Curated annotation (Swiss-Prot):
It is found in: Cell outer membrane. It is a multi-pass membrane protein. It comes from Escherichia coli. PROSITE patterns: FIMBRIAL_USHER. A 97 kDa form of the protein is thought to be due to post-translational processing of isoform 104 kDa. Belongs to the fimbrial export usher family. GO terms for biological process: pilus assembly. This is Outer membrane usher protein CS3-2. GO terms for molecular function: fimbrial usher porin activity. These proteins are essential for the biogenesis of mature CS3 pili, but not for synthesis of the CS3 pilin subunit. The lineage of its organism: Bacteria, Pseudomonadati, Pseudomonadota, Gammaproteobacteria, Enterobacterales.
Amino acid sequence: MYFDAGESEDFCIQYSVLQDIGVTVSGNQDECANLDDELNLRTRFDFYSKRMDIFVSPKFVPRKKNGLAPIKLWDEGENALFTSYNFSEDYYHFKGDARDSYSQYANIQPRLNIGPWRIRTQAIWNKNNNTKGEWSNNYLYAERGLGNIKSRLYIGDGYFPLKNFNSFKFKGGVLKTDENMYPYSEKTYSPIVKGSAKTQAKVEFFQDGVKIYSSIVPPGDFSISDYILSGSNSDLYVKVIEENGSIQEFIVPFTYPAVAVREGFTYYEIAMGETQQSNDYFTQLSFTRGLPYDFTVLTSLEYSGFYRSLEIGLGKMLGNLGALSLIYGQSNFSKSDNSKNKKWDIRYNKNIPDLNTYLSFSAVSQTRGGYSSLRDALDYEIGEYTFNSKNSYTASINHSLGELGSLNFSGTWRNYWENKNQTRSYNLSYSTQIFNGKAYLSGSLIRSELMNFNNKISDTILNIGVNIPFGLSRGIQSVSYNTSSVKGGRSTHQLGISGSEFDNKLYWHVNQGYSDNYSNTSMYGYYKAKYAQVNAGYSVSERYNHAYGGIEGGILVYDGGIILGRNLGDTMSIIEAPGAENTKIRGWGSIETDWRGRAFIGYLSPYQNNDISLDPSSLPLDSSLDITTNSVIPTTGAIVKTTYNVKKGKKVMLTLKKSNGDAVPFGAIVTVMDGDQNTSIVGDNGQLYLGSSMDTGRLKVIWGNGEDKKCVVDYIVGDNKNIAGIYIGSAEHVFSSMLLYGKKISFLSASVWXVIGVVKAFLTTLQSNNEWRTHSEKNDFSIDFDVGVGRSFAAVGPTKDMSLGANLTSEPTLAIDFTPIENIYVGANYGKDIGTLVFTTNDLTDITLMSSRSVVDGRQTGFFTFMDSSATYKISTKLGSSNDVNIQEITQGAKITPVSGEKTLPKKFTLKLHAHRSSSTVPDTYTVGLNVTSNVI
């Protein structure tokens, strides 16, 4: 997107830019899109903020995909090395003759990012009083995303994340669907809602009384699938609101099937490599596809030299009858006596909204010897698995009691082929709020049984717990009590108190336990420091004392340097905010920037927009932010960088007043006329707060459309500040009209100095009441303006040459700072009385006086008077005794030069212009100029 220099103000937006932001257009990516005719786009461009707003018709913008960003906006992040570490030590002192023991542990996980590649490894060190310390490596692999096929590739040695297979360690590679690259509504099963609207209507979905979807549909049939469920198993309540207010209502039955993905979604896994346990090569393939009519099909294959298996599954939504899934599997393990085995796996789910009840049931039946996965076969070789299971059944019931709480039951029953053993377990639990929601009560009854022939072993445990949160930001936050009783055995009681301090950086917990004349007191806490987290604990009992402690954190190295911090997940962001040292990051607890304004955070959502905000209330007093929130869209495992523009300076409160003493109106727009063009709004009574200001600056104030509703204010911040560290100032005599500004005025002494205006050289034309005329070529420009009675004017700038002109109607003062300028031409058209020019110089070697005369009646005369009380100067042409120079006598120019022995003119002096006329009947007009030459640019 760009402007053509010298052409019209129309700009070019390439098709590629529109496509990147999600507009559905087609065309040559490098060509400019036809905005008006083709797309009917509207645009708005802010030159100062460099912001372009594009307004697009909804028909060119596809429906938002539930937070997933366009692929072209995904950020692979910085090349960086992040290393997390965890060091801990335990020490036990046993009372009596037992020997004390200790152990030491270290876990170091370097993570290297190079472009889209993520290289991961882990090193673990263990040592105790019985063994020497030794290092071990759990994994070393590289991974990357493949956005064009929405997949993820892993290559190396380790445990790889596979959804449809039991995990084991191997050397090889994995290619699988990256579900994070799909929006939730495209991958997760939810029923397609179909209906018909008589008019343009609003369609709303509700689940458990909560609105989860709302959209406008045209007249006719509609089919909606791009919505996100609330996470419950409740039916969908659909409301269609027509234009005339009539409402259609219907219910769509829903239950999460055990095997189900969205129609059209495909999930696959491919794994190949060499197993660590047996050094055998293997292949694993898995494929899941969502089909029409609420069907989902699943198939998987595992193959090795000694093992092979096949699974086929089918899931189906049954509407009001619930959801059913069926999986059939067959395996062949050549190293087992029962090599050919089969299994059937049936799962059923049903939600009953009228009873606030959810049911689930599963049954698995296996042939003699038992079905095995490849992981089972590998464990069998080292004696860690036996193919003995025959049937297993699992059931659960979840029932809501409304304000009385919730009641849940689950049970498992299993039998075996060889020894006729049976195992059963039951769990009944209840939870509710008590004391009007000020405390929580929970309880559970757990029973387990093991039956072998005529023997039966059972165990029953009753647990009851109460938790009372205080909702405090510091100090004691909660008190809890838990008791556990074993039938025919001991009972235990635990009383705990938890709290936090220092803005939740310090967490602590104290627990007192008692069981059968045996007591235990323990204390535990951790502190979230800026660069690491430390933890420690100590417990005392009749048998032993136990002390432990540790430290964990992370070190990030990238091209910008080194950042220390806590270990914060895999997908991360670097924060760079120079000038915002020790500033908190919103939503990240106690994490804050270091002394350079740098930090890192983690646990970002990949492929989605993540907002990262600095807390302005924690900024240093002399800092402010133009924008407090930046957005990043990282890929999985990326370390992206986000930068904040921090302004250093005093926080200033000004009172802006017009020349008549009235305050500048509420809501007036104020622009700080520096390189960043920051804007603010005037508050009540003309008060203006500048979040960050230099000691001096210039403000442009606008409160209306007319020239009498505009002004420019210069200010200097003094030392007057209030208890909050805000400096106080005021602005009197604010004037309309404005020119351009380039540099601060260094010689002003007032805390706030009013000026007529300032001019910036990039403007080509500016006109106001036919009095303003500007011209600009490269670095040179000239201005004519009306000064008026009692007005002051200040002109400064980084340009090389500048010309100024003024109608001196009644004793005006022109204040000129020549500091950055090499040549200045100052001209004055004056009709009567006196004009004064106050100069501030920067190593000026001479000033040349120039004049041209517009004579109306031939009788007018005028002269310069040079005045300075601190030194004597001469003009190179012949002067009269009064140092007056007749204008008619200096047609070739006259120079003001330093006195003998001096190299430059003084830093500040005053030159007074005076004109008189011999006839009062005809107005006279003179043009007087100054050519100032400096040897310093």
